């Protein structure tokens, strides 16, 4: 019967080892997930502050969120996303909206569009894309400063027909060998401004307004 006892002991040891391993893996996962969440949040905050620098507001933009419904046509988003409010004291001075250009050359181009209370653009940043390296990827600020041409633009600057690449009668530069990508970002930005304008009473509402 010693061999039965030995088997029983071995089974107990294996079960104990498996339990300890599972706990260790669980703790490792939680620790890794926490680190990943922290890094994602830090990157997100950095992008928001590129659009509205610290001197333009006194709130933590990354924490001042509102929900944007899925399938919001003007923003091009398919799933529910978050937008951000930018405040100075009790005044909402701007918003940062999620926008997706569905007509990129290689698929969706996701961006953040900052719009001030007066309807002017504070900044635009492309946060995800699959555009061709060396061509369409110039929408990324790390590749070129093309995206900065949106700064201070509005629905009146330029007029509606100016929101296109120069090749098609607009005021924005196209890329050599790539017209589809910049045009997609241009139109997505314009639509985001239109969304902000149409929903200004809600987006820029203060606590005093809602009281």
Task: List each model region and its residues.
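Flexible, solvent-exposed loop/hinge segments and secondary-structure transition points
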Residues: 1-211
């Amino acid at each position: 019967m010693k061999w039965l006892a030995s088997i029983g002991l071995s089974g107990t040891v294996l079960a104990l080892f498996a339990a300890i391993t599972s706990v260790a893996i669980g703790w490792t996962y939680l620790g890794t997930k926490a680190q990943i969440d922290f890094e994602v949040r830090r990157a997100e905050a950095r992008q928001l502050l590129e659009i509205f620098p610290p001197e333009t507001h006194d709130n933590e933009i990354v924490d001042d969120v509102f929900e944007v419904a899925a399938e919001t046509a003007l923003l091009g988003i398919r799933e529910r996303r978050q937008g951000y409010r930018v405040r100075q004291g009790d005044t909402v001075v701007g918003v940062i909206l999620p926008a997706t250009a569905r007509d990129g050359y290689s698929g969706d181009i996701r961006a953040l569009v900052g719009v001030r209370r007066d309807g002017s653009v504070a900044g635009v940043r492309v946060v995800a894309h699959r555009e061709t390296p060396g061509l369409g990827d110039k929408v990324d600020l790390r590749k070129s400063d093309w995206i900065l041409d949106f700064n201070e633009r509005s629905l009146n600057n330029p007029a509606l027909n100016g929101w296109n690449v120069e090749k098609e009668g607009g005021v924005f530069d196209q890329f050599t060998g790539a017209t589809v990508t910049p045009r997609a970002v241009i139109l997505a930005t314009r639509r985001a401004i239109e969304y902000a304008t149409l929903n200004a009473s809600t987006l820029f509402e203060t606590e005093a307004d809602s009281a």
